[in-house]
């Protein structure tokens, strides 16, 4: 991997060196051309003023390159030289100009021309020429072509390996199918070099076409064969057109002479037959020229000699080839039967049929013999296979038993070797552990000795320090007592400030309590809460407790305990009136409940019972004891109209409980300060 990563960097380095050398040579050639042209100019200052820095750098590069590579190559002249100099690479001739070089070239830059002769400073050097884009474009095109070629070759290679990619590549990539087929053909020729050779060098067997058979025109199978032989076509001339011809044919006379003398009755019969095409097509045979036509019911006599048709071959076998041959022969027989000269070919066709039947029987017998021979060969092959399989199983068992014995011996040998090696390792580990334990004990003893020495030295130092500080012990005690007095003074100041704040806060809380309990009617206590909040400062507990109070409570006031009990008694009477009402009660139910409440007896306080009377009794008892929280819980257990009637009373009790809880939290905030005062008082 390291070699592969270094190779591209080396190639890039060599390419950079080549490009640098080429650019240097191009610059040297241009400079030589400019210096050759400068001989015709009036002065050499224009060249130096146009390209001073560029020529100097080129001269330096060229001089160092020529001095390092060739000693016989002349160094380039300075920019102030006015002589025409040939390009680099030509051997140095003798200088003939008065201003030529008298010493060999060196790497030192030539002196610049004196600036006193010029009236203005030289212009700044021109910017370097832009790099040519031609080389970059050509390189990019070359890389693109190489990449496309590699990708195309990779696609062809992968198409030969993968069927899915083969389908994609041959369908969508131009000329992909031709390339893949070409490489597949090369691979086929490489694997089978003699395949095409046998095909090309195989001599063509002579084709046995047999005797040439000529079939006359208008012969073969036709739709006319299926027509009724007893019918006649009145549109064509023939023997059916004249009864004389039929009679002559029967008597053996000349048909031609008889047909040339038609009778009047024949003409009338032909006209009648041609005019009435829908009638029967049976022609009426005539026995004599002077007699009238015979009736249609009389059977027709044949005009020509009857030709016996050749029977087609029956299907011999189920073999498709023989059946195809049978169809061909039957087709030939049908063609012959359609011809008028079928009687002439009856004997050869019959002989051919016999030969064909014999051939079919021979093929059947050959097939049977081949089938029997194949069955025998299959049986022999089965027997040979069974024998070979038995022999193979026996050999496999023998080899397996031998390998098992060898493996067992090797296993025992390896087990003994492993046991011996583990015994040696255990022995070595035990010896090492013993040595490490002994060394550890020695190290612990040395550490204990060092610790004892350190402890002894520290004890000595402690005693010396105690003796040294004995004189200053009383001074240290006095300074400590003074510091304690200062702390006590600062603490008393804090206690006094906290005491004042606590007293003020206690007064504010008591003012809130008195405002809640002393008034006969509810009144707002916003000022008292503001005083408590201002005295508490930024304490989060007190602020949270005051924020938890419902604004309606301190804006309108809350009832006192006596007012809550008095209102409960009025609400209880109304609840008793509606205690017997269901949830969906009407006017009649309200009236009935009102009348029944007049005769109901009031229960005493009981510890159990979920009826309305029991809940009201327990609530009244709790209110007399001052337990508003439990009383509110009892009233909250009501359902239906009873709970609806006591909803306002529960809201007032809830506001009272919220205010009391907030005041209790404020009182708990005062407890740490009170305990601190008690502590300092005891101290």
Swiss-Prot record:
Residues 1-11 form a transit peptide. It is found in: Mitochondrion inner membrane. It comes from the Eukaryota. The chain crosses the membrane at residues 140-160. GO terms for cellular component: MICOS complex. GO terms for biological process: cristae formation. Keywords: Coiled coil, Membrane, Mitochondrion, Mitochondrion inner membrane, Transit peptide, Transmembrane, Transmembrane helix. Residues 161-683 are mitochondrial intermembrane. The keyword Lyase does not apply. Residues 12-139 are mitochondrial matrix. It is a single-pass membrane protein. Residues 110-131 have a biased composition (Pro residues). Residues 61-134, 199-300 are annotated as: Disordered. Its main location: mitochondrion. Pfam families: Mitofilin. Residues 61-74, 93-109 have a biased composition (Polar residues). Residues 367-444 form a coiled coil. Component of the mitochondrial contact site and cristae organizing system (MICOS) complex. Component of the MICOS complex, a large protein complex of the mitochondrial inner membrane that plays crucial roles in the maintenance of crista junctions, inner membrane architecture, and formation of contact sites to the outer membrane. Plays a role in keeping cristae membranes connected to the inner boundary membrane. Also promotes protein import via the mitochondrial intermembrane space assembly (MIA) pathway. Belongs to the MICOS complex subunit Mic60 family. This is MICOS complex subunit MIC60. It comes from Trichophyton verrucosum (strain HKI 0517).
């Amino acid at each position: 991997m390291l070699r592969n990563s270094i190779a591209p960097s080396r190639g890039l380095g060599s390419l950079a060196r080549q490009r640098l050398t080429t650019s240097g040579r191009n610059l040297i050639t241009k400079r030589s051309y400019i210096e050759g042209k400068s001989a015709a100019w009036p002065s050499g200052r224009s060249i130096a003023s146009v390209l001073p820095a560029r020529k100097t750098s080129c001269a330096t590069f060229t001089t160092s390159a020529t001095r390092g590579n060739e000693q016989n190559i002349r160094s380039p002249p300075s920019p102030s030289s006015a002589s025409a100099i040939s390009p680099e690479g030509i051997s140095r001739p003798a200088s003939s100009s008065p201003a030529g070089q008298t010493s060999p070239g060196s790497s030192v830059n030539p002196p610049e021309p004196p600036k006193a002769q010029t009236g203005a400073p030289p212009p700044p050097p021109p910017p370097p020429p832009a790099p040519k884009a031609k080389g970059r474009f050509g390189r990019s095109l070359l890389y693109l072509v190489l990449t496309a070629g590699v990708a195309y070759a990779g696609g062809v290679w992968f198409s030969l390996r993968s069927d899915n990619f083969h389908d994609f590549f041959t369908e969508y990539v131009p000329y992909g199918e031709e390339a893949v087929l070409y490489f597949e053909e090369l691979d086929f020729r490489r694997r089978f070099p003699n395949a095409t050779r046998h095909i090309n060098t195989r001599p063509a067997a002579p084709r046995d076409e047999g005797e040439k058979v000529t079939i006359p025109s208008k012969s073969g199978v036709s739709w006319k064969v299926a027509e009724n032989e007893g019918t006649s076509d009145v549109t064509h001339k023939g023997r059916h057109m004249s009864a004389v011809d039929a009679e002559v044919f029967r008597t053996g006379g000349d048909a031609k002479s008889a047909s040339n003398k038609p009778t009047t009755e024949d003409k009338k019969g032909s006209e009648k037959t041609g005019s009435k095409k829908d009638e029967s097509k049976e022609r009426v045979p005539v026995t004599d020229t002077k007699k009238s036509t015979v009736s249609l019911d009389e059977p027709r006599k044949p005009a020509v000699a009857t030709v016996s048709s050749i029977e087609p071959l029956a299907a011999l076998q189920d073999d498709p080839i023989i059946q195809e041959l049978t169809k061909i022969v039957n087709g030939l027989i049908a063609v012959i039967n359609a011809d008028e000269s079928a009687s002439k070919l009856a004997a050869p066709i019959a002989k051919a049929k016999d030969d064909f039947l014999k051939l079919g029987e021979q093929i059947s017998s050959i097939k049977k013999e081949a089938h029997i021979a194949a069955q025998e060969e299959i049986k022999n092959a089965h027997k040979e296979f069974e024998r070979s399989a038995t022999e193979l199983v026996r050999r496999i068992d023998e080899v397996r038993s031998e390998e098992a014995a060898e493996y067992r011996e090797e296993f025992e040998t390896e087990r003994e070797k492993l046991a011996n090696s583990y015994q040696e390792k255990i022995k070595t580990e035990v010896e090492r552990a013993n040595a490490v334990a002994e060394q550890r004990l020695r190290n612990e003893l040395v550490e204990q000795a060092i610790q004892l020495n350190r402890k002894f030295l520290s004890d000595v130092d402690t005693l010396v320090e105690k003796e040294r500080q004995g004189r200053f012990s009383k001074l240290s005690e006095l300074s400590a007592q003074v510091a304690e007095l200062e702390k006590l003074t600062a603490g008393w100041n804090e206690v006094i400030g906290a005491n004042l704040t606590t007293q003020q806060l206690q007064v504010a809380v008591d003012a809130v309590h008195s405002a809640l309990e002393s008034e006969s009617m509810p009144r707002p206590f916003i000022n008292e809460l503001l005083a408590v909040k201002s005295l508490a400062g930024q304490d989060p507990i007190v602020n949270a407790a005051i924020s938890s109070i419902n604004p309606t409570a301190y804006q309108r006031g809350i009832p006192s305990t006596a007012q809550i009990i008095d209102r409960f008694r009025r609400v209880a009477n109304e609840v008793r009136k509606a205690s017997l009402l269901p949830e969906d009660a009407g006017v009649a139910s309200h009236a009935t409940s009102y009348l029944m409440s007049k005769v109901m007896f009031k229960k005493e306080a009981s510890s159990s019972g979920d009826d309305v009377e029991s809940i009201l009794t327990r609530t009244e008892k709790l209110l007399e004891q001052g337990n508003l929280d439990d009383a509110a819980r009892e009233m909250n257990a009501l359902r239906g109209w009873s709970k609806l009637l006591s909803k306002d009373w529960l809201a007032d009790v809830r506001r009272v409980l919220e205010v009391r809880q907030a005041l209790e939290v404020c009182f708990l905030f005062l407890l740490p300060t009170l305990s601190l005062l008690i502590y300092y008082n005891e101290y």
